[in-house]
Amino acid sequence: MIELGVNIDHIATIRQARRTYEPDPVWGAVEAHLGGADGITVHLREDRRHIQDSDVRRLRETTQIKLNLEMAATDEMVGIACGLKPEMAMLVPEGRHEVTTEGGLDILAQEARLKGVISRLADAGIVTSVFIDADPEQIEAAARIGASVCEIHTGPYAHAFYDKGRDAEAPAVLAEIAKIRKAGQTIRHLGMRFNAGHALNYYNVQPLARLAGIRELHIGHAIVSRAVFVGLREAVREMKVLMREAAERGE
């Protein structure tokens, strides 16, 4: 069954806006789990703009929730990950001036270095993931460096969906779905797990949730936004319902 990983970075963003101690993203993780989240995603950025080291440490010390740590492929972050031992570590590109992650990791440009990073994480018993565009050359490179999971960047699909008036049958939207579908087929053929995420919401999630072989979707901003009005447990529950309905129908 398809799984949902809830990104709680935006809970920390609200807290950091006032440089205070609430809302607590760790409690947010508990609420998301009670709502049906299969795992929690946090991005410990180099500039610590939202999630802090103490948040990730407390998540490991006080909860039993499956943790996916998004991280840049730096020595500092690899050291932190190897100490914390999250269930999964996902390598992402990171720019100090970006509002959110703007594209997939360019593995081809740094293949040798990333292979070493993946090896260190795997030796620590951590499942390794890479966040990449739906590009067959990047997928093949992910396999060469030893990644266990490829998470496909769904931003281009989400933007096309919005630009075309939320019409899932618009040619531009169908073209993006086809790219992700093909990427998923390649990922699975190469023996890796097929995940996806970025800019997914309650309107656009179902066409992707029904793709063959997709294992997990990571969603954050839309769920936290919905939680403002209905609470976090209910926001997560609603997303899980949509995902499961789509997955059961399939393609």
Curated annotation (Swiss-Prot):
Signal peptide: none annotated. One of its GO terms (biological process) is pyridoxine biosynthetic process. It catalyses: 3-amino-2-oxopropyl phosphate + 1-deoxy-D-xylulose 5-phosphate = pyridoxine 5'-phosphate + phosphate + 2 H2O + H(+). GO terms for molecular function: pyridoxine 5'-phosphate synthase activity. It comes from the Bacteria. The keyword Transferase applies. Gene3D superfamilies: Aldolase class I (3.20.20.70). It holds the Pfam family PdxJ. 1-deoxy-D-xylulose 5-phosphate binds at D9, H10, R45, H50, T100. It is found in: Cytoplasm. The active site is at H43, E70, H198. Keywords: Cytoplasm, Pyridoxine biosynthesis, Transferase. The record marks E151 as: Transition state stabilizer. It is an enzyme of class 2 (transferase). Pathway: Cofactor biosynthesis; pyridoxine 5'-phosphate biosynthesis; pyridoxine 5'-phosphate from D-erythrose 4-phosphate: step 5/5. 3-amino-2-oxopropyl phosphate binds at N7, R18, A199, G220, H221. Its EC number is 2.6.99.2. GO terms for cellular component: cytosol. Homooctamer; tetramer of dimers. Belongs to the PNP synthase family. Catalyzes the complicated ring closure reaction between the two acyclic compounds 1-deoxy-D-xylulose-5-phosphate (DXP) and 3-amino-2-oxopropyl phosphate (1-amino-acetone-3-phosphate or AAP) to form pyridoxine 5'-phosphate (PNP) and inorganic phosphate. This is Pyridoxine 5'-phosphate synthase. The lineage of its organism: Bacteria, Pseudomonadati, Pseudomonadota, Betaproteobacteria, Rhodocyclales. The gene is pdxJ.
